[in-house]
Amino acid sequence: MKLLPILLLTPLLSFGQFKERAAIVAAGLIAGVADGQREVIVHNPHAYRYRHPNAREAWWNPDSTWRRADRYAGPLVFVADKYHLNQFIRQGMFVGQTTIVAVITVGDYKANGRILWGKLAINLLLMQGSYMLAKGLTHRYYDVFR
């Protein structure tokens, strides 16, 4: 019970700029894990089945989705299976990261009258670096047959 108030109060202890960068890194990590799982599901389903033996095959196997495609037509295709859900999460996190970086850049431009290229480069490196790190670690986690 003590953990909940601590988790709720933790963001208040950070500085504003670190909160923005933490959001960029967190979104990159989530996007990287989602994309790594999506690629493992497609290219190495045996490793996914080995790591998650109790997962329903109808949920994680994208080959079985086309049989149920008429139920998931339109914008709700991400509820069809794990592959599409991971793709939806990855794209949503990319949009979130890009929006945060754009808002920071526009805010700096309005405050200073110029674009702070160094800060923009650091934010873009954090954005791409966190994504690639999480994706690589996810691939390594599922790489059980090496």
Model-derived features with residue positions:
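Hydrophobic alpha-helical membrane segments
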Residues: Q17-R146
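Sec-dependent N-terminal signal peptides
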Residues: L3-L13
